[in-house]
């Protein structure tokens, strides 16, 4: 039953800018850095998780939410004999899937670009295949909690303010706290902090000089588990609030 809701939600975005954005954002990121071959992989990842991906994720969630929250303000959905709780969770599921697909495309472009540079310029890969895959997985999981948050923000304050708050202020806050002792209590810093250990990239784009201070595997796993728990909490909370508002 839940899969039917997800399929229905996905169909709403057929031939829309939301689907285009899934491909456009990774391609723009790769293209912006391809002409600096020596640092292509490092710069691409840094630009992706610091700037392009937060914008992509936020805008994707906002566009998904606004698809039903236009002139009708969910009245069309509320009139249907469906579970409003599941309708909202389907939006979360579709946004999460789009995030995964966008990150997978970025991973493929980063590695293809790295191999192309190896062949053309004889510059070896600075980030290996498994390291890149691990880094991409960390980006997806550690940012997953933003999906229900962005959907709810979009419902309450609209696209523009949501982008400013999440992709703007949130990202800036994450950058400034990622290298401090406050990183664990600031969810926005989880991705940039993980990238220090997993990919060896500082938030300012410079490579990590001393890898001896890198987090252990279990510490990285703990952060990812906390992110998943936070995602589950926000998903259930926003779904309940949505159901109460639309049904009540």
Regions found by a protein language model. Name each.
Residues 39-40, 163, 168-244:
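Terminal transmembrane helical anchor/hairpin motif
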Residues 64-97:
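Helix-loop-helix units of permease transmembrane domains in multi-pass membrane transporters
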Residues 25-29, 94, 166-173:
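Transmembrane alpha-helical core residues of multi-pass small-molecule transporters
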Residues 69, 73, 109, 113-122, ...:
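Membrane-interfacial segments
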Residues 27-52, 56-57, 93-159, 213-220:
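Secretory targeting signals
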């Amino acid at each position: 039953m839940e899969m039917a809701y997800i399929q229905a939600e996905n169909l709403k975005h057929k031939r829309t800018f939301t689907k285009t954005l899934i491909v456009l954002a990774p391609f723009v990121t790769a293209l912006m850095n391809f002409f600096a071959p020596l640092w292509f992989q490092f710069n691409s990842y840094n630009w992706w998780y610091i700037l392009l991906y937060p914008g992509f994720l936020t805008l994707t969630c906002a566009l998904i939410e606004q698809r039903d929250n236009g002139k009708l303000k969910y009245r069309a959905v509320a009139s249907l004999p469906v579970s409003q709780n599941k309708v909202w969770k389907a939006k979360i599921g579709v946004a999460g899937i789009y995030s995964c697909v966008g990150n997978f495309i970025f991973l493929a472009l980063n590695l293809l670009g790295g191999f192309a540079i190896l062949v053309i310029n004889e510059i070896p890969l600075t980030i290996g295949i498994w390291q890149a895959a691990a880094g991409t997985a960390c980006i997806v999981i550690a940012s997953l909690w933003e999906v229900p948050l962005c959907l709810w923000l979009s419902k309450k304050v609209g696209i523009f303010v949501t982008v400013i708050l999440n992709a703007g202020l949130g990202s800036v806050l994450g950058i400034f706290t990622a290298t401090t002792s406050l990183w664990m209590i600031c969810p926005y810093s989880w991705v940039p902090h993980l990238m220090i250990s997993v990919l060896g990239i500082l938030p300012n784009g410079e490579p990590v000089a001393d890898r001896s201070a890198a987090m252990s595997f279990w510490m990285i796993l703990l952060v990812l588990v906390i992110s998943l728990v936070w995602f589950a909490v926000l998903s259930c909370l926003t779904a309940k609030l949505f159901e109460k508002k639309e049904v009540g």
